[in-house]
Each structure stands twice: as structure tokens, then as C-alpha cells.
Amino acid sequence: APALALSGRLGDTPIVLRSAAVGFAWPGSLAARNVDVALGQPDAPNRFTIASLTGQLGTNLSGQFSGAEARLDAVPLDLVDASGTWNYTGGILSLGEGAFRLLDRVADDRFRPLVARDASLTLADNRIAALAVLREPSSDRIVTEAKIAHDLDSARGHADLLVADLLFDDRLQPDTLTYLALGVIANAEGRVSGTGRIDWTGDAVTSTGRFTTDKFNFAAAFGPVDGVSGTVEFTDLLGLVTAPDQRLKIASINPGIEVYDGELSFQLEPDGLLVVNGAEWPFIDGELHLLPTRMKLGAAEQRRFTLKVVGADAAQFVQQLEMSNMAARGVFDGELPLVFDEDGGRIEGGLLTARAPGGNLSYIGALTYKDMGAMANFAFQSLRSLDFKGMTIGLDGELDGEIFTRLRIDGVTQGEGAKRNFVTRQVARLPIRFNINIRAPFQRLLHSFRSLYDPTYVRDPRDLGLVDSNGRPIAAPTIPAPLPPDIQPPDSRKVP
């Protein structure tokens, strides 16, 4: 037949079937192209299109299909490129050896395609029951097992989802499952387990889920994050919406100085909006807070984070930076605003301020070089301990480039342990302010603090041939003048 147009019932289920060219014999073979099937009530049909349908017609009806697509009206997920076997016996339609791709129907896909093989489906008594194991295609890793039940009469159904110890590593990353993770999470390592459920009627779809990790590591824009643990509850799993105030423990985070044992509060809202309610960590006898912020997942936009330092102890800070020959006393508060965009990350207007009544900076190690000279050694011993009444530290610049650090130290006097003499006693009567500007790459800046005070951290310039054994600079070697060329240069004079 050149074409086919049928309507009726498959068991108790209304069915409308149309196709292009069809060839069949009874008993015998069936071959059909471009088959369009609508199952269920006319106002909310479940549609199936099949590019190729073949089979054997007799006591049992069976065959193969390929190039099929399936769409449940109430569920915003579509099956494409489906193939497998079919069998109709005793009023029961069975599909087996099913392979397909699962796509998000939303225009801006929330989920990347998943694939299945060896899926199965039965239609009996007007009810569909299906089982499929869904995999991420590039890694072939199982993401979830789905068990589906659907009543064609009521257009109601549900899908139970099981995620069993899903491993994220160099083969599978969050952004290979959803584009919303791009620019938010990278280099993920860890396992996630949980369950989800999707329920639908002819009018609405609801979906929920709970997913847990015991240890999840990843790289974020503001630094590496290790040991994330906890459970996240979704109130709209398909829409990636969570219940308010989801909390995760964070073993450590390193925005430049590593901090430990924190907790993050957040929620995911409709349209891919991540709301960070805040996070906090113990920080060198004080606290480090991530202030509330909002960002659109999957969008190329400027993102701002602010780290707030409360009651940071200067002595602990020096230890964190491994300044083995430096000691400090004082308490600091401040904020470090971080901005991330397509040009990278930077600090804008970072400021740390010492609390009253001030503090102390002191050098507690031996001099790096023993031959600095009598006056230099005398001055160093006199100023090796400084008390201050006020200190501010300003920070600006690119996180992957140069950071400008401005130190302003007010009310400077000699501290305990410094040698006093006539000069220092006269200086002590004067109001002194130190203004120090440091310009260096951010990561190198942290190392520079240590190299200033730890003689084992940098190489001796005498070993590099920059100074002699007495500390005097070594003159640069004299470069001899070039020898006359072996070949006479051309003579360009005019000759008669």
C-alpha cells in the first residue's frame, strides 16, 4: 500500500496510526516506513514516530524497529534515535533490546543527552511499564536507573530514579551532565548517590530528589574546594530547584590561604539562579565569611564574591604563611571583594584593618647575612621589634597577575626586645607612619612574605655570583670588542 491511516484500539488503548509506504502479507512479512503513532486520549496523546518498522505476521507478531522517537506529552524529556525489537502476543506489546538517546525538551537544555541500551517496555491493560539504564555517552558511565509506569487512561505516571555511587573523575565531570555547571565547577572528584522521582498527570509534572556525597572535591573560581559532604534536597529535580537553605560541610577551601571545617548555605531557584546565603570557616583564631551573593548558572556574566575576615590573629596568619623568622601580634578585620568575568579574577578594594590598640611586628631569627656591616647590623637590631597603633592592608589586582598591596602602619615605636640607643630614643619622640607598597603576582606575593624573613627560602647571592665573600658586588665581566671580519666589506666608493 502506498500509505496507511488507521484508528482503533490496541487492547483498551486508543491508537491512531499513519505511515508512508507499507508492505505486508498475512501470514508473512511487514515493512513500513515513517510510521506515526498516537497512543492514549486524543487531547493528550503520547506520540511515537518510527522511521523503519519490520516484522513477521502470524500466530505471534514480532519484528524490529529503528529510527524511532517517543514523546510523552506530560514529561519534558524525549527519546530519539531509538531502536530495538517488538513483540505483540496475548494482548501485550513488548519492546526489548532498546537503545535510545534521552533529550531535554526545554529550548535551553538543562541536561545533556544520555543514552541507553537493553531497555525494555511492556504495554498491557492500558499501562506502560519500562526500565532503562541511562549512561553518559562519552564515558559510558551509568548515571541513573529509571523505572517508569504510565496509565494511558488517566495520563498519570511516574519514574523512579536511582543514582548508585556515581563517580566523577577525569572521565566524567558535572558539565558533561549539565551545561549549568560550566564556569562554576571544574576538576570534580568524588561520588554521589541518591534517589529521585518524577510524577506526571495530564496537566502537570512534579519531581523531587535527594542526593548525598561523603567527599567531593572540585575547583571553583575562588580556589580549590576539598571534602564537601552533605545531602541536597530538590523540590523540582527537572528544573534543578532545591529547598531553601541547603547546607554542605566543606573540609577545606584555598582562596590563597587554606581554611578548614566550613559550612555553606545555598539554594537553587528557578531559571538556573544560584543563591548563596553565606558560608563561614574558622580562620586563624577568627572567622572567614563568604557574604551572600547570587549568580545565574550557565551564563557568561560578571560574578562577585566577598570574603569577610573577622578577628584574624596576626600571629596565626604569620604561621599560615610559614614566615619562620617573623612574629606578630594583633587582630585584623576586613573584606576582600573578588570579581570574576571573562578576563579572569581580581581583587577590588580589599582592605584589612588592625583592631585597637594595635600590635607588634618583630624579627626573631638570625640575620640572613653576617657581613651586612656594623651600621646596618646596629640599625637592624634596633628596629627588629616594632609596636604599632594602627595598620591597614589594601589589596587590588589580578589573581592570576599582579596584586598591589599597600601597607600603612601608624604610631610606630620600638617594641620589646629591640636595642635602644640615642638615635632610636630621639626617633621615638616623633610621630611615625610607614607606607609600604608591594607589587607582585598574587601567588608569588605569598611566597615573597616568607622569603623576606626565612634565610633558607631563597638562595644566597654569593652562591649566584652576585657578590663576593665580603658582600661586595661583583662587577659584570668585560665583553671584548668584536674582532675585524675575515672578509673585507664591500667598497661602495665611486671609481672612474
Description of each model-found segment:
Residues 1-195, 207, 214, 218-325, ...:
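Interface amphipathic segments
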Residues 332-333:
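Short, solvent-exposed loop/turn segments enriched in Ser/Thr/Gly
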Residues 347-367:
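Short helix-loop boundary/capping segments
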